[in-house]
Each structure stands twice: as C-alpha cells, then as structure tokens.
C-alpha cells in the first residue's frame, strides 16, 4: 500500500490508489506551475513549490529498472465480507488491498509534504480565489473492461461517496456543484473562497465506473452501490481481484494491459505480478504464520514481540530481516477514548481522573520493554504539536475563543501525569479521587457513586485478544478508585457495528494526522460529525471552540498560520481531556523473509513503502527457503 494523506486519515477505509502520470505527452507550457490563476498544471502543493517539473521521468526514490514478477503474501487481521468501498465504515468489513484496484485523480509524492501529481487527471487548474477547481482527465485512462474513464464517472463517484459515506460527506461538505465542463473536464464549485485545501483534496476522490455500478451482475441482478457486495469490482488500477474466499483470503493479479503502466509516477512501482492477503484472527496468530513462512512481510506493532519473539532460526540465519524505517509523515493520537455522549463522561474532571489513574511508566517497563514514549499531542512528533504555553500567532488565535476554553491552557503546558513508583502512583490516585469528588462522586463501601447513589461502571471494549493485556493492566488502577470495570472482547464485525452506533464506554482508538491537516478535522472532532453514525468523531465532541479552530486550520493562508492554528486546536483538545493518551514509537518496525529488494535511498515520508516501490529479488529468493 502506498502511504497517502487519505490513507493516514481513514483508519477504517481503503487507502488511496497507486500513482501515475501521462503516456500522452503534454507541453511544459500547458502544464506550467505558475500562480493560481487558472493555468493548467501537472501538480499541486498546499504550500510552496512542487519538486518535480512537468517533464519528469520518474520519482527519485524509485528504481526505474526494478525487476517485474513474483508474489507477495501479506497479512490481514479479522475478516472481510465486502468489496464496496462506498459503504466502508458504514456497512460490512472491507477487504484489504482494494486500493490496488481503484484510482484517484491525483497521487502524492513520498518525498514531499502535501504535494500531488496527476494520475487519472493529466492536468488541474483553479482561479486565484480557489472558488472552484477543474480537472482534465487523461484521454487514455481506461477501466479494466476497456471503456474510457469519463467526467461522468467522476461525477457519479462524487455524488455516490458524498451521499453514502459519513467521511466523504464531511470531507467534501464545501463542494456545492460538480459538472462536466468539457469532453474530458470536470469542475467542482465550492461554497466559499480561500480554502487552500479544497482544490487538492478533491483530487483524492476514488473514481468508480458508473456504467458497471448501474449495470447487472452475472446473474442479471442490478447492482446496488449502497449495499455490501462480494462481487469483484471493476477498476482502473494496476491490479484486479484474482480470487477470494470471504473472511479467509483475497488475491490480486497485475493487469496485463494496465493503461497507466508507463506513466512517470508509476515507473518503478507496481512491480509484483501478484499480491495475496491472508486473514488471521489476531496478531499473535499472524506472527506464528510469519514464523512458519506463510507471510512474507510483517509490520510489528507490539514492542514485546519485537524484543522477544524474533529470536528464531531464520532470523539468526539472516533469512528473515528485521528493519526499522523512520516515521516522518504523520502524527498520531492513540488513546483510551471516552464516549462522551454518555452522561458519566461529560464532565472533563472525570475524564482527567482516568488519566491520573493510568500507570504508563510501569506498563512500559513490564509490557513494552521500555520501548515507548508517552503521547502528549494529537499531532505527536510533528511541528504541529502544541508545546509549552501558547505564544505568538497561536496565542492570538486562542484569544478569539478565550471564553470557551479552559483557562489553564494559557498559563500551563499540557503534561500527562507521571507514575512508575509507589509514591507517584499514590499521589496521582489521590488527585484522581479529588477530581471525581469535585465532579459529584464519592466512595461508599469501596464503590464510587454519584449523587444519586449510582455506581460508576465502565466497559473497556476491545477487538483483539492482544489488547486485553493492556486493558487488564489498567483495570486495577481504576478499581482502586472504586470504579467497576469490565473488559469485553468482540470480533471485528461486532466491534465495527458497535462503534458505528456508539455502543461503547471506552475503546482504544487512533487518529492518524497528516502534515497538512484540514477538512478531515471536521470529521474527527467537529460538532456536526458527532451525530453522524459511522463518522470518525467517535468521542462525540461538540465544542464551539473546537469548531472555530477547525475552521481556522482549514482556511489558513500560509504554512505559518496552519501550524499555529493546528497547535491551538491540539491544545484545546488536550485540555478537554477527551482521551487518555497512550504511547508511540518513532519508527515502523518491519520483518520480512529475504526475498525482496528496495531502493537504496528510501523516500523521506514513505516509511517502508512496502510493497509499492519494492520488487522480487530472484537471487535472494533462490537462497531463501522454498515457500510452503
């Protein structure tokens, strides 16, 4: 999968498509970068200049002579029962890998921040006030059945996603009109001006074949884009579904006559003949499958396993390679997240008390071998993270919402409580109890009760047995406060359904953030999204100050303003204690059977970029064990 802004943002849906640029030559004059004055251009950047000129041959980080062929066996956790990306996050469990089939208008470069180049679109233009954007499709873009990709397909895709996906409904809420404005042109009109992001994020739209979705299947039944389906989808991308067993495996094969194989942003990518995803119940089972050479490549998210589980013969014999890749392209909030739609979590003092009870330091020592850092920002590890006390432009922005935010955020830096030794634990539990009493609770007969005498009971909902260890470690600290705690583990299908309907108290959730946040923040934290089932506002935040700051982020006129506005948003979210932050690690941990090659210089913002820019190495494969 290629890491893109959208794939970072959409944890529950499919990632953006793999890249491309034209086989049909365009003049440099026609695609000059220029100012935003209606000039056709080959790429877009939110801030600053783009790196690659109109006539570039390929991205610098790829191997243009990469060998072709071979198969990659990859892992997926849980199950799947759906190939329809439109209803992802709303209905069913989406199959892994569908980003290989579906393409977008534009595609990002992995060595630039917030820069995209043409994929299905050969060129893009917008007026100086950014009140609209027009994309011109490539004349040679084709669906796998040979039919051309048309503006009607783009219009159909936009209307379908916006009507049926909470994510896209929020993401594209400022688009008021979409119309065909030329034989190969499609224009999106916005309800305002000055939104720097809108012309670019429209290019992230996955494009679907209108004629296929409005047709019938092999049994003569009319397809319904609003429902789940296990019929392999028609796409325009470099791969198509070869075979699938619902809930167990799905295999993709390279499209022999793929229209975009010679595009310059595709050179050096899509090198494998086949890709296969095998499904496992949880990460522990998947690890054993990897050890048994049933999986080729694994991303390891558990510090304990990274430290202890990779001491097996194939690692010692260098047949399995462990390698870490720096994470520079995303900030991440991973946390215990409250459902503040429920009365017991509406008071921020209650939520803050839960943070005082979380002994991260001891958990890090016992469970994670000291590998992790505590998260202290929704944009952890980036220049967007709030630090210290607000100053300069950030302070000026916060003054506009001064009466709607906690006063402490102006004079105190946000910090998580530090535990780890008996005295600290005792002091923090005492502070937690003080906060709970201020919120109207008291301890009676070892139970925490509210003013009505009702006991505080919470359920920690998880979807993988591996998470049970984490929540069971947290549970005794909460019980020491008199809180009744239950832990419930459900399968992925049940878990998704409960989240869509907000049927939970506390979950482990994560929100990936790009280096250029924007419209998606409405879906994460905006008041309107709080009432939309299936939205990413899992917490249920309805906060006027947050809404105001989200709009300031979206309509920032410079990188400086964007950074300051995002820091302000981050600070307000932190000081409302909507979550108990967990932990992070600044590298992507990977393990692979030594059958593959990758470029010597990896893209700065691509992490491992597997399998996008990797290839099958016949010489290495010959020395590796024969696959089972």
Q: What is each residue range found by the language model?
A:
Residues 96-114, 159, 203-276, 281-285, ...:
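Gly/Pro-rich hinge or "lid" segments in bacterial periplasmic/extracellular proteins
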Residues 138, 227, 258-310, 352, ...:
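Ligand-site clamp/hinge motif
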Residues 8, 14-15, 26, 35, ...:
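Detector for C-terminal structural segments
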Residues 118-122, 144, 149, 189-210, ...:
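Aromatic-rich, solvent-exposed beta-strand/loop patch
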Residues 177-180, 242-253, 278-342, 349-353, ...:
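Extracellular/periplasmic solute-recognition and catalytic clefts
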Residues 34-129, 156-159, 234:
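N-terminal lobe/hinge region of extracytoplasmic solute-binding protein
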Residues 136, 170-218, 236-245, 389-402:
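Surface-exposed binding/hinge segments that line
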Residues 62, 66, 89-96, 123-167, ...:
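Aromatic- and charge-enriched surface segment that lines or borders ligand/interaction sites
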């Amino acid at each position: 999968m290629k890491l893109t802004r959208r794939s970072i943002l959409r944890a529950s849906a499919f990632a953006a498509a793999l890249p491309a640029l034209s086989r049909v030559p365009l003049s440099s004059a026609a695609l000059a970068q220029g100012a935003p004055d209606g000039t056709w251009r080959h790429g877009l950047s939110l801030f600053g200049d783009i790196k690659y000129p109109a006539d570039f041959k390929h991205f610098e980080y790829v191997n243009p002579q990469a060998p072709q062929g071979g198969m990659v066996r990859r892992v997926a956790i849980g199950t799947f029962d759906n190939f329809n990306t439109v209803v992802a996050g709303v209905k069913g469990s989406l199959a892994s890998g569908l980003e290989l089939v579906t393409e977008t208008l534009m595609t990002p470069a992995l060595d630039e921040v917030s820069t995209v180049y043409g994929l299905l679109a050969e060129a893009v233009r917008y007026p100086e006030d950014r009140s609209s954007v027009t994309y011109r499709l490539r004349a040679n873009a084709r669906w796998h059945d040979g039919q051309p990709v048309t503006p009607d397909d783009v219009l159909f895709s936009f209307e379908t996603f916006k009507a049926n996906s909470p994510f896209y409904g929020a993401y594209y809420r400022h688009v008021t009109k979409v119309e065909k404005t030329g034989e190969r042109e499609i224009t999106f009109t916005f309800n305002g001006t000055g939104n720097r992001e809108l012309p670019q994020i429209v290019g992230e739209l996955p494009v679907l074949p209108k004629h296929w979705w409005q047709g019938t299947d092999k049994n003569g039944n009319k397809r319904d884009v609003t429902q789940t389906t296990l019929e392999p989808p028609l796409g325009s991308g470099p791969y198509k579904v070869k075979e699938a067993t619902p809930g167990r495996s799905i295999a993709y094969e390279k499209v022999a006559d793929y229209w975009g194989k010679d595009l310059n942003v595709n050179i050096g990518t899509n090198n494998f003949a086949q890709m296969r995803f095998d499904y496992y119940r949880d990460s522990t089972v998947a690890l054993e499958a990897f050890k048994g050479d049933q999986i080729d490549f694994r991303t390891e998210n558990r510090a304990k396993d990274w430290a202890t589980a990779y001491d097996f013969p194939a690692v010692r014999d260098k047949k399995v390679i462990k390698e870490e890749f720096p994470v520079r392209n995303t900030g991440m909030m991973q946390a215990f997240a409250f459902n503040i739609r429920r009365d017991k979590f509406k008071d921020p003092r209650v939520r803050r008390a839960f943070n005082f009870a979380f002994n991260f330091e001891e958990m890090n020592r016992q469970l994670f071998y000291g590998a992790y850092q505590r998260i202290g920002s929704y944009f952890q590890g980036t220049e967007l993270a709030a630090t210290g006390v607000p100053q300069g432009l950030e302070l000026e922005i916060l003054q506009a919402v001064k009466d709607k935010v906690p006063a402490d955020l102006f004079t105190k830096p946000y910090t998580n409580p530090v535990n780890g030794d008996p005295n600290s634990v005792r002091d923090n539990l005492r502070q937690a109890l003080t906060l709970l009493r201020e919120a109207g609770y008291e301890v009676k007969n070892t139970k925490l009760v509210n003013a009505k005498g009702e006991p505080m009971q919470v359920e920690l909902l998880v979807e993988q047995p591996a998470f049970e260890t984490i929540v069971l470690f947290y549970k005794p600290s909460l019980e020491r406060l008199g809180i009744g705690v239950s832990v419930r583990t459900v399968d992925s299908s049940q878990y998704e359904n409960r989240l869509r309907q907000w049927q939970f108290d506390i979950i482990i959730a994560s929100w990936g953030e790009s280096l250029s946040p924007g419209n998606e923040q409405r879906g994460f934290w905006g008041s309107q999204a709080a009432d939309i089932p299936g939205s990413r506002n899992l917490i249920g935040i309805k906060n006027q100050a947050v809404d105001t700051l989200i709009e300031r982020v979206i309509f920032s006129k410079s990188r400086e303003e964007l950074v300051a506005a995002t820091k302000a948003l981050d600070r307000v979210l932190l000081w409302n204690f909507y979550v108990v932050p967990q932990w992070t690690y600044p590298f992507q941990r990977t393990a692979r059977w030594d059958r593959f090659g990758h470029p010597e210089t990896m893209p700065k913002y691509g992490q491992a970029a597997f399998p996008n820019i990797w290839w099958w190495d016949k010489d290495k494969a010959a020395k590796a064990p024969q696959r089972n």
